[in-house]
Every structure is written in C-alpha cells, then in structure tokens.
Swiss-Prot record:
This is Dual specificity tyrosine-phosphorylation-regulated kinase 1B. It is found in: Nucleus; Nucleus, Nucleolus; Chromosome. Dimer. Interacts with DCOHM, MAP2K3/MKK3, RANBP9 and TCF1/HNF1A. Part of a complex consisting of RANBP9, RAN, DYRK1B and COPS5. Interacts with DCAF7. Interacts with RNF169. Belongs to the protein kinase superfamily. CMGC Ser/Thr protein kinase family. MNB/DYRK subfamily. It comes from Mus musculus.
C-alpha cells in the first residue's frame, strides 16, 4: 500500500517532488539573515561561550563610559542627587554611612551648606557659610559609624591640643574652629583654605616649581614639624603628602598642614599600616617601631617631588616601593634589617654575609640595582636642574643644588636616629638664601624672591569655585596617584596661575621652640648651643621662624595694623632664638635610638657649599662656583 507524500515516519522531510521547491528557499536564506549573523566571530553563541570574558569587558566599558558622561554633565555638588537608598539614619545617610548633603540646607540655625568639596574614607567635606561669624568655613562630616567616630575623636583631641599651643596660628597647622554633633555625625569646622600642593604641581604640568619656592615651602614645613615635635605635643602626622598640604591663599606661598585623621602621639601608636605609599618610610615598610622621624622622611620625598614634578619613589606596591628606594639610597644597614620583622619580604641574606633585594614576581623588570639612580641625577645638580629646565636661572646654581641635595639626603637617612631633625633642618645651609633675603634693607616688598617664577604671573579669579578641603586626603593608598601621574598630561584643569613664587609669607618673629621630643641629630645633641643662630661654616644668620597670617600681606605694602605684630613697633626685633633647653628624652624614643644606631658614628655637621661636592661624590664643581649663592 503506497503511503501518500507527507505521511508516515518521515513525514517531516520533503518528498522527492517537494525537494526541488525547498532548494531555492535554502539558497535565499543567507540573504534574509541579519548582517550581524554572517560573521562567526560576532555570533551570539560565540559571544556567550568562547568570548564570554570579552563580552563582559565590553559591557563594563559601555556602562562606565555612560556613567562617566553622566557625571561630567552633572557635577556632584549635592550628594542628595545621587541614586542612593536613603534608608540609614532615618533617611539622612546613604548606604555608605555618609550624610546626604543638600545645598542650601541650614544646620543649627547657623551654617548654610554651599557645596560638597571633598570626599574620602573618613567621610565628606563641605563648604558652608557661618552666619554667626559671617565667613566661609570647611566642615568635615565624619561617617556615621563607630570605628570612624572613634578615630575622629582622636583627631579632635590632637587638633584641640595643637590649638592650645598655637593660639596665634603661626606654625602652619590647620585651625579647628569648633565641633558639634549633627544627626549622629561628628562635624569638625575648619578655616577654609585653598588648593593643595598636588594641584599646584598639576598647574605646572608636573614640571615642578622653582628651587626658591621649594625652599619657602620647606622652611614652613620644617617649622610645622618642629612644632609637632615639642615635648608637650609629640605628634606624628603619619600621612604627610602634597594632597595634605594646602595653600592659605592661591596668590601666596603660605601653607598649612591638614588631615590629622591618621595621627597619633609618640608612645600611643595604634596602626602599623600608615603613610601613603610614595611617602612611606623604611621603618614602616620593614615593620619596625616608628617615631616622629617618619614625617621627616615624607618631607624629603615631598620636597624632591615639588621641584622635579614627579614622585621620587613611585612604587606600585610595597615591594616595588622598597626597590625604588634601594635604587637611590642603596641597601639599608644590616643592623636595621636584622631587627626588622618584615625584612625577608624585600631582602635575602647573601652566603658570605650582607643582604640583597629578593627577586620576586612583584619586583619590576627594569630594576637596575642598589644605588644606580643617583639623587644628583634626579635633581640635575650639574645639568641645570631636572631635565635641564633651570639652566641659567638665578637661584639654581650648582651650589644651590648641592645644599638642597645634602638636606634631602639627611632627611632620607635609613636609620631614624640618624635622620635630621626639624631643628637641624632649619639650621641647614639650604636656608641661607632665605636668611639673606630676610636681612634685605630695601623698600617694602623688595624681599620678594629674585628667582623667576616658572608659574609666571598671576592670577585671576577667586578660589570659590574649586577650593580644596581642609579635611585633606585620608587613607594610605597611592593607586589613584599612580594613575594620575601616568596620565598627567591628560588631566583636568589645575588651579589658576598663581604668583606664590613672588610672594612669600610675612616673616615675623616668633617664640623659639625646643627641639623635638625624640632628640636631635647626634652631632647636634652633644654640641654646645649655637649662639646667635649662626649657621656653622657659612656665617649666615638663621632666619626667624616664618608666620602664616590669617590674611596674606600685600607684596608692595606692609600688612594692615590689625595684622601687625606688636613686637615690630620700635626697634627691629631680635629674631635669634636663645639656646634651646635640653628636651626630656621620651623612654620609647631613647630605647629606639639606642637600638637602631648600633654604635654608628654621628653624621658630620652641614658643610660649607664649597666642600659639599666631593663629599656627595660630585667632581668638577669649581670652588668659586660652589661658594657663590
């Protein structure tokens, strides 16, 4: 019995008579398919199997590109506009325990919130108007979380302690005006400052500022560290970096240190993982006890960065950070490594004694070896400054660079006990030019620097639009910094051009400070006091400790009467500090220094510039050139 076509077990297949009708349809099928399906590499099956990782990456790129465009179109000045789940703290906090800032909101019938100007791991910083004092302030709003509140209370205690010992606000520390609790958030009210030093570097396209401006910044920072090191304070900042050093005014070189959120007092250390990586000291990397000297290490790194435009040690991780330090300074002393708990993370013993850097996966491939990257080459001591950019400029002679190099090397001593102290740094020959300027007898304003300003002239507009926070930049990560430096020529706009090279802070007399609680450099501690503040080997006078006024002085006229120091009335004041009284040695610091020095001979005193060349390994610097300033 014949089975009709289209029936039976194989009825799904075309019969012989239908075969000829199907073939044309099959031939036409590719024409009907979408163009995207014709490429095997773009087929959905391949995208969801073999190329699944590529598919996810593409989705992420598209998502974050759209997110970035939205962020650029609507600047986040008001955190209430963000799509956050407002379910915490009765709807006042977001999912990250940060207060939801609303522009125009009024707190305590006193503070009118203007905008959000900074955010960090601690919380947020807003700009606000104080209707009671009729001034703009910066309010640091701590996260509504117990751990952050506890740490902020330590910061509050240290800030109040510093305020008690710096009632005239002349030691370059940010001034805490008051504090209060608002909707379960601790709020710290600070004076409103301007841009930070990283913004200043970005404004130079990361080519660095002049040696003259670097000197002014260094003198203020050394004075601030000397203040923090007084026995009554003994405060370790623990996170000194360009982002935490702010200009008081965008047209002046007066600065203040901010963000004491990671700080502690000597003998009350809480954390082992401190300092931002680029500025982290060897003792912190190695896990040995640390003291106030870690801030001096950070300062040495900052000064080099401010002049060259790039970090001296820009490690991508701790192993890379140590390798970059070794490239410049060599292997740390053996006694220091033998006592370090984390020494074998970076180093290994040699069979015949001594230490060498471990070859690990984290060690970068272009590592050259100990001492192969000399500081004199980084600074361009004999080649006209970094990249030869300062060749022929006044104030950038080989003698100036020799003094600067010697000061930095003393700040970057491996052993904390051998590292120069703030008092020793202020007495260094690098500041002799500042002393000469301070004795200038010309008309008002003639004491301004004669060094040309690489930032050129000046400035425009106010600072209200892009003010940095007084809260600083908390945290110990440099990942974002590394990204910004690797893309430094493609970044956003910096602060407006300033003339802070030409306008130094008013130099006024101040009460002398005792040496830091941890003791001075060995050759300073056991010498007779220096009379009349004369710099050894130079005959120059030690400059009076500079002062940061609440309102910057005009470069061509004396400050107004309300800013004049009463000691200026009458005869010129005596700016020479009396011989410092011996500071009591803190037991922890004394034990640390005894353990770390290991019988090491003391450093020689700062030499005359004419003798610095041979001692630093430089040759060919004529005596007449080295002796000139």
């Amino acid at each position: 019995m014949a089975v009709p076509p289209g029936h039976g077990p194989f009825s799904g297949f075309p019969g012989p008579q239908e075969h000829t009708q199907v073939l044309p349809d099959v031939r036409l099928l590719p024409r009907r398919l979408p163009l995207a399906f014709r490429d095997a590499a773009s087929a959905p099956l391949r995208k969801l199997s073999v190329d699944l990782i590529k598919t996810y990456k593409h989705i992420n790129e598209v998502y974050y590109a759209k997110k970035k465009r939205r962020a650029q179109q609507a600047p986040p000045q008001d955190s209430s506009t963000k799509k956050e789940k407002k379910v915490l703290n009765h709807g006042y906090d977001d999912d990250n325990h940060d207060y939801i800032v609303r522009s125009g909101e009024r707190w305590l019938e006193r503070y009118e919130i203007d905008s959000l100007i900074g955010k960090g791991s601690f919380g947020q910083v807003v700009k606000a108007y104080d209707h009671q004092t009729q001034e703009l302030v910066a309010i640091k709003i701590i996260k509504n979380k117990k751990a952050f509140l506890n740490q902020a209370q330590i910061e509050l205690r240290l800030l109040e302690l510093m305020n008690q010992h710096d009632t005239e606000m002349k030691y370059y520390i940010v001034h805490l005006k008051r504090h209060f609790m608002f909707r379960n958030h601790l709020c710290l009210v600070f004076e409103l400052l301007s841009y930070n030093l990283y913004d200043l570097l970005r404004n130079t396209h990361f080519r660095g500022v002049s040696l003259n401006l670097t000197r002014k910044l260094a003198q203020q920072l050394c004075t601030a560290l000397l203040f923090l090191a007084t026995p009554e304070l003994s405060i370790i900042h623990c996170d000194l970096k360009p982002e935490n050093i702010l200009l008081c005014n965008p047209k002046r070189s007066a600065i203040k240190i901010v963000d004491f959120g990671s700080s502690c007092q000597l003998g009350q250390r809480i954390y082992q993982y401190i300092q931002s990586r680029f500025y982290r000291s060897p003792e912190v990397l190695l896990g040995t006890p640390y003291d106030l000297a870690i801030d001096m290490w950070s300062l040495g790194c900052i000064l080099v960065e401010m002049h060259t435009g790039e970090p001296l040690f820009s490690g991508s991780n701790e192993v890379d950070q140590m390798s970059r330090i070794v490239e410049v300074l060599g292997i740390p002393p053996a006694p220091m490594l033998e006592q370090a708990p984390k020494a074998r993370k970076y180093f290994e013993r040699l069979p015949g004694g001594g230490w060498t850097l471990r070859r690990t996966k984290e060690l970068r491939k272009d590592y050259q070896g100990p001492g192969t990257r000399r500081l004199q080459e980084v600074l361009g001591v004999q080649t006209g400054g970094p990249g030869g950019r300062r060749a022929g400029e006044p104030g950038h002679s080989p003698a100036d660079y020799l003094r600067f190099q010697d000061l930095v090397l003393r700040m970057l001593e491996y052993e904390p006990a051998a590292r120069i102290s703030p008092l020793g740094a202020l007495q260094h020959g690098f500041f002799r030019r500042t002393a000469d300027e301070a004795t200038n007898t010309g008309p008002a304003g003639s004491s301004a620097s004669t060094s040309p300003a690489p930032l050129d002239t000046c400035p425009s507009s106010s600072t209200a639009s892009s003010i940095s926070s007084s809260g600083g930049s908390s945290g110990s990560s440099n990942d974002n910094r590394a990204y910004r430096y690797s893309n430094r020529y493609c970044g956003g706009p910096g602060p407006p051009i300033t003339d802070c090279e030409m306008n130094s802070p008013q130099v006024l007399p101040s009460q002398p400070l005792r040496p830091w609680a941890g003791g001075d450099v060995p050759h300073k501690t056991h010498q007779a006091p220096i009379s009349a503040s004369t710099l050894p080997g130079t005959g120059a006078q030690l400059p009076p400790l500079p002062r940061c006024l609440g309102r910057p002085p005009s470069p061509t006229s004396p400050p107004p009467p309300e800013l004049m120091d009463v000691s200026l009335v009458g005869s010129p004041p005596d700016c020479s500090p009396p011989p410092p009284a011996p500071a009591p040695q803190h037991p922890a610091a004394s034990a640390l220094r005894t353990r770390m020095t290991g019988g090491r001979p003391p450093l020689p005193p700062p030499d005359d510039p004419a003798t610095l060349g041979p001692r630093l390994g430089l040759h060919g610097v004529p005596q007449s050139t080295a002796a000139s300033s």
